[in-house]
Amino acid sequence: LDLYIVDAADQERRPFVVTENSEWGASLSPNNDYVAFTTDLSGQYQINVKRFPPTEERWVISSGYGEEPFWSKDGSEIFYRRGNQWLSTPVKTTPEFEAGVPEVLFEGPYGNVYGISYGVDANGEKFFLLKQPDQAPPNEINIVNNWTKELN
């Protein structure tokens, strides 16, 4: 998977991050100057940030594993998921990009889906998570009589 930019005016597809690895889950900063995304460039999924429009600069903002980045409304932090934990990394986007130390906000079960599995309110205080599917108890039992005869 790679990331591309599509200009709405001419419908032209231009590369944003194209590598031998997987890049997905792009999230544009509120000031439209940076994009956070998930990549396995290091061998495990991590959250990276690049300028928009793209340059060669890249910042890793997750400590270890991370996926599903989501910018806060004011652009002061990037939320992301690491397994069953949700984290926040404080960031500054002006005058230059700078990332702080990630902090675990909370943890718990979630519904893991392809793509983004959560949302954050405008204040960055409430998270909306997909509920993990309930495991329904079996509602049927199959009984096989004389099952040893079936082996012959």
Predicted features along the sequence, with ranges:
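Beta-propeller blade-edge and WD-like acidic-aromatic loop motif
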Residues: L1-P15, D33-Y34, T38-V60, D74-E77, ...
